[in-house]
Amino acid sequence: HMARLSGVVPMIAMVLGPCVGAAAMMAKLSDVVIVAKPAGALMMAGPQVLASAMKKDIKAEELGGADVAVKTGAAHFACETEADAMAKAKAVLGMLPANNLEDAPFSVEEDMNRQLEGFEAGCDGAELIAALADAGSVLEFGKGHTQAVTALGKMAGRTVAFVYTGKGDTCDNRMKKIARFVRFADCYNIPVVSLVDSTGLKLFDTVERQMAVLNAASTLVYAYSEATTGKV
């Protein structure tokens, strides 16, 4: 059922306790994954199983706690409490349409023609997006997972998907993160604004990583090419 609903209606998985194995895979079928501290953890195998295999004790928080899940790309948001997670879910839903046939919520809150002070002073990706978007509207997805920045925000009241490549050479993990986000935005007809600050593709000294970059690059090109939403 979740696979059929993917990209049709927004699905948010809230991980408020241990979420292991098949349950974790079900959570990953959602559009957005939110993990709440202190009990939330997203894991392929629990601490007892891994402790037996690795011959050492390991905590659920270290395996897939909120911060670990976001840093590794398994989740999009880490929240301090369950209440914060609820609020984050509401904020995300406030950016998305009810389904893929409707428009995202719209409200005119800010003048797009406003002057951006210090915009050319060498901001980082998150600061650039915050400057372009309506004040206080940005929700960054997967903060800390690679140097790429992906975020939903408003521009003149309309929901926009922002992508920042990160500085320097672009690695496979950055491209996979961006490709997934572009596809997510395209499902709900959300225009994509891309900010490119890359010098090219990253070269690694192992064949495996070189092939990973090649595969991720083709996935990224495909994601942008098949997207029918507006792209800037």
Predicted stretch roles:
Residues 1-232:
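Ligand-binding clefts of soluble mixed alpha/beta catalytic domains
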